[in-house]
């Protein structure tokens, strides 16, 4: 569960950026950050791309990842020429955090911070 925010970090529920329900990314042109991923005590699924048959590529992340960047370029380079691509990038801070200071964590010498995220395949039921 996440909530897309505009450049002022305001929720944009009900707009074209509200992807909480199943939404086709065909023809989409996104380069946006989503927030409010913090209400988790453990690693959890934070985003997924699901095929019509229910199979999905799932992104999971530890609670340290409070943000998710969605990028859908139409001109991603490939062997057969440019094509559409989708990137789901878990992030610990939102875009422009070095200027805004939002969610920045200072790591002092000798401190250790560990966080994990990953991608897995979820088969369609019945496969």
Tell me what each language-model feature is.
Residues 43, 112-114, 127:
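A long-range scaffold signal marking pre-active-site subdomains of enzyme folds
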Residues 98, 121-127:
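Short, Lys/Arg- and Gly-enriched loop/turn segments at beta-strand edges
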Residues 106-123:
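Short Pro-Gly-centered flexible turn/kink motifs
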Residues 35-38, 71-72, 89-92, 99, ...:
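Generic, ordered loop/turn and secondary-structure boundary motif
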Residues 1-64:
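Active-site/ligand-binding surface loops and adjacent short beta/alpha elements
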Residues 48-95:
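Glycine-rich active-site loops that engage anionic ligands at enzyme catalytic sites
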Residues 46-48, 87, 114-118:
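Beta-strand secondary-structure signal
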């Amino acid at each position: 569960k996440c909530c897309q925010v505009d450049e002022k970090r305001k929720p944009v529920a009900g707009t074209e950026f509200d992807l909480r329900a199943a939404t086709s990314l065909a023809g989409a042109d996104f380069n946006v950050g989503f927030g409010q991923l913090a209400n988790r005590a453990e690693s959890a699924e934070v985003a997924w791309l699901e095929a019509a048959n229910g199979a999905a590529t799932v992104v999971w992340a530890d609670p340290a990842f409070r943000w998710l960047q969605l990028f859908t370029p139409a001109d991603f380079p490939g062997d057969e020429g440019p094509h559409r691509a989708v990137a789901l990038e878990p992030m610990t801070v939102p875009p422009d955090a070095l200027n805004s200071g939002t969610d920045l964590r200072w790591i002092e010498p000798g401190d250790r911070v560990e966080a994990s995220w990953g991608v897995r395949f979820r088969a369609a039921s019945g496969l």
